[in-house]
């Protein structure tokens, strides 16, 4: 496909779009999944389903950003519950467990709550590296990704 981009660089924008469209169609028809990447962090994946000729288009960067926010929100909820954080006390991604009053036993209980909520297993070494809500969310995202891979 790279040679096609070089060949169409001197055409008008509409000619380039037509040429790329036909190339994309050819690539998609020969593969079950194709991803397009740009420098602007807007990744698009096109997957064909074997049982139908329809295509599934998703914006991966947006999906990942949303998943991280959802993960952080769930971690905040679990931390608030485990530490009995008073209403009105903000718990954000940057919140440190120790600043919220957590001791080592509280941290173990938080990790157990995270394991239950996300259906993951956190090893002891990784659990000791968790100091903030964001640390926990990053570890969860990593473990969930590894589990589904």
Curated annotation (Swiss-Prot):
InterPro entries: ACP (IPR003231), ACP-like_sf (IPR036736), ACP_chloroplastic (IPR044813), PKS_PP-bd (IPR020806), PP-bd_ACP (IPR009081), Ppantetheine_attach_site (IPR006162). The modification O-(pantetheine 4'-phosphoryl)serine is found at residue 104. 4'-phosphopantetheine is transferred from CoA to a specific serine of apo-ACP by acpS. This modification is essential for activity because fatty acids are bound in thioester linkage to the sulfhydryl of the prosthetic group. One of its GO terms (cellular component) is chloroplast. SUPFAM superfamilies: ACP-like (SSF47336). Residues 69-144 form the Carrier domain. It holds the Pfam family PP-binding. Its main location: plastid. Pathway: Lipid metabolism; fatty acid biosynthesis. It is found in: Plastid, Chloroplast. The keyword Chloroplast applies. Keywords: Chloroplast, Fatty acid biosynthesis, Fatty acid metabolism, Lipid biosynthesis, Lipid metabolism, Phosphopantetheine, Phosphoprotein, Plastid, Transit peptide. Residues 1-59 form a transit peptide. GO terms for molecular function: acyl carrier activity; phosphopantetheine binding. Carrier of the growing fatty acid chain in fatty acid biosynthesis. Belongs to the acyl carrier protein (ACP) family. PANTHER family: ACYL CARRIER PROTEIN, ACYL CARRIER PROTEIN 2, CHLOROPLASTIC-RELATED. This is Acyl carrier protein 1, chloroplastic. It comes from Hordeum vulgare (Barley). The gene is ACL1.1.
């Amino acid at each position: 496909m790279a040679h096609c981009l070089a060949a169409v660089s001197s055409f008008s924008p509409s000619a380039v779009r037509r040429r790329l469209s036909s190339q994309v169609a050819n690539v998609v028809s020969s593969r079950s999944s194709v991803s397009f990447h740009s420098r602007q962090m807007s990744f698009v994946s096109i997957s064909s389903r074997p049982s139908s000729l329809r295509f599934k288009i998703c914006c991966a960067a947006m999906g990942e950003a949303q998943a991280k926010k959802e993960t952080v929100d769930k971690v905040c909820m679990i931390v608030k519950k485990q530490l009995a954080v008073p209403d009105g006390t903000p718990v954000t991604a940057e919140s440190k467990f120790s600043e919220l009053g957590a001791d080592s036993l509280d941290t173990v209980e938080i990790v157990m709550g995270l394991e239950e909520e996300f259906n993951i297993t956190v090893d002891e070494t990784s659990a000791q590296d968790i100091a903030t809500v964001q640390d926990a969310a990053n570890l969860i995202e990593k473990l969930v990704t590894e589990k589904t891979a």
